[in-house]
Amino acid sequence: MKKLLILSGKGGTGKTTTAAAFIRFAGARSVADCDVDAPNLALVSGGYPETRETDFKGSDKAKIDENLCIGCGKCAKMCRFGAISPAGGGKYAVDELRCEGCGLCTEVCPVGAARLDKDIAGSLRVRSGDGVFADAELRMGRGNSGKLVTEVKRALYDAAGEAELAIIDGSPGVGCPVMASMNGVSLALIVTEPSVSGFGDMQRLVRTASMARVRTAVCVNRSDVSP
């Protein structure tokens, strides 16, 4: 299977629009949106009436059982992230957005009221019908975006079977989700624009792809809009 990854570096260059055009003109039946922070390729890609959605479990998060908590406050004093605070009634609770899952609270709690649970950090969707479309969405304030991108690609490849071509819409930037999306692709197409930031981010992507040993090509978009 040939795997075409479409990236941009700078946001707003027309990456997703270009990806949608490639999907249509190539007649691609295996498609993925790996922009897990803000997936939107599905808005311009129809023909997938059936959806199978599963939870994505990311890092651990602390929980405090209020029935066991004795209100000693040791967990709150030891938490360097300020994720534990009084919750009323002499009990303590965890702010899931602040918690880093280090597990220190579970070690210092004298009654075992604190525990670590796998956090549902997002959702993974596989749509089918006129082909296969995989995407995902990360919940606000969650990490593990690179891991979720890997899960999206794995779901696509498993469902695509013997398809000859897969087109993947990556995320902007050069961070973890972009690095994860580059793994194993045949070619990375960088959609850029003739602006200072567009050119600079394109150069960063080319260097990143070179380190990952991924071939690159460049599409200069919006040439008559941002001369």
Model-derived segments and spans:
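Phosphate-binding/switch loop-helix module in NTP-utilizing enzymes
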Residues: 83-91, 95-100, 106, 138-177
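Residue-level preference for the first positions of well-ordered beta-strands
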Residues: 3-5, 28-30, 165-167
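Iron-sulfur cluster-binding cysteine motifs and their immediate structural context
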Residues: 74-94, 104-119
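FAD-binding core/adjacent interface of flavoenzyme oxidoreductases
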Residues: 113-148
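Short beta-strand-centered segment that lines the nucleotide-binding/catalytic pocket of NTP-utilizing
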Residues: 29-42, 117-124
